[in-house]
Amino acid sequence: MNLLKKQFVKRNYHKETLKITIDMAWPAIVESFFVAFAGLIDSLMVSSLGSYAVAAVGLTTQPKLLGLALFFALNVAISALVARRRGEKKQDSANETLLTAIFFIVIAAIISSIAFVFFASAIIDFCGSTADTHNDAVVYFRIITGGMIFNCIQMGINAAQRGAGNTKITMRTNVTSNTINILLNYLLINGRFGFPALGIRGAALATISGTVVACIMSVASIFKKESFLSIPYILEQHIRPTLSAFLNLIKVAYSVFFEQVLMRIGFMLTAIMAADQGTDAMAAHQVGMNIMALSFAFGDGLQATAVALIGRSLGSGDPDLAKEYGRTCRLIGAVIAVCLVAIYYFGASGLYHLFFTEDHIVAIGVQIMHVIIFVVIFQICQVIYMGCLRGAGDTLYTAVASMISVTFIRTIISYFCGYVLGWGIIGIWMGVLGDQVSRFIFATVRFRQGKWVKIKI
């Protein structure tokens, strides 16, 4: 608390700015944390089937996220544009953006879903599956991608709601969705209370069921007449999807899309190298990624807050306030990072013992956790600063920075330390650390330069 107070005074933060940031940030943080926590619980429940099952689910993560790259990019554009229009007090333009995005999302999701289901086996094979993981990974991947349209729609609407500052709506949606996911995991993976024991198939069905509920809740949230984003308002004002709105989305999203694709390629190469270390090492790696996702969740929640507040400030013509919101989010993130470092340091062994009874896998996991401790320090702050830049429309810079860091630095260091130096799975995690440090440097330098506040979107 003394550290927080000293930084607060030193940087001349305004109490009102901090209050507004916290009020908007806590629902976004809870939402992101709960999504990551549900992923960790998924792995915990799947681990009851054996380390091969954890590895099988882990194999599907990066190709699934690669398939969602287009939608992640679109979500960044939706949030940034809606936030900017909110600041400009242009409700009609914000709703036009939302409606145009939804139409595009539905078409793109249907096409993507069909392609992933059809090519599932080849994709999983490319990702480094083995005889004991391939079939289960394919089944899981087909179910998840077969229902991706529900996930894509709810992500798009939630992105718009975050841009408008309605973080409590998206929190309720995702907390409900993931609660259903966890409950159905408990019932369907091993078969309880008369439900069939479906194993990995049950885990996938639980995830899809939660996503369907989230989609319904998200759609319902835009049927309120008094909301800034509102279907009744759209009908009343005769708003239609337009080419100009679509082009605005593409203008912001195109560089984010390439950023996402190149990042996912880098992540996938890391996952392939991890899978090459053996099923046990891959299982430990997957749990480590889930634990790291918990720390990312805090940064992601603050990032969503920064996008909304910075977009609104720039839209109303106040770049100094936009910078202050960015610094405030970063300060909160730094305090959270210190707390997580302490938890991960003292709880490393205990966390891995929740997932595995095999001592050699736990030993691998503890070594991974020692790397994650350093990763977290840079990760949360870079995620927030990158979010600030994207929210202002500086997406080309973030794309180049992420490409250099993830696709090249991460991959090269992982290969060198993992194979050339012979450090195995720990060497691969050194690549993860190098990536986070690189992105932190890129993001911090750009944020402090201040050029991003002058970008028009």
Give, region by region, the residue ranges found by the protein language model:
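Transmembrane helical elements of multi-pass membrane transporters/channels
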Residues: 23-42, 143, 177, 210-214, ...
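Transmembrane alpha-helix boundary and packing residues in multipass membrane permease domains
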Residues: 28, 32, 43-44, 80, ...
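Short alpha-helical transmembrane segments in multi-pass integral membrane proteins
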Residues: 1-28, 82-149, 197-254, 310-375, ...
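Short runs within selected transmembrane alpha-helices of multi-pass transporters and secretion channels
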Residues: 75, 79, 144-163, 170-178, ...
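Residue-level hotspots within pore-lining transmembrane alpha-helices
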Residues: 30, 34, 38, 67-71, ...
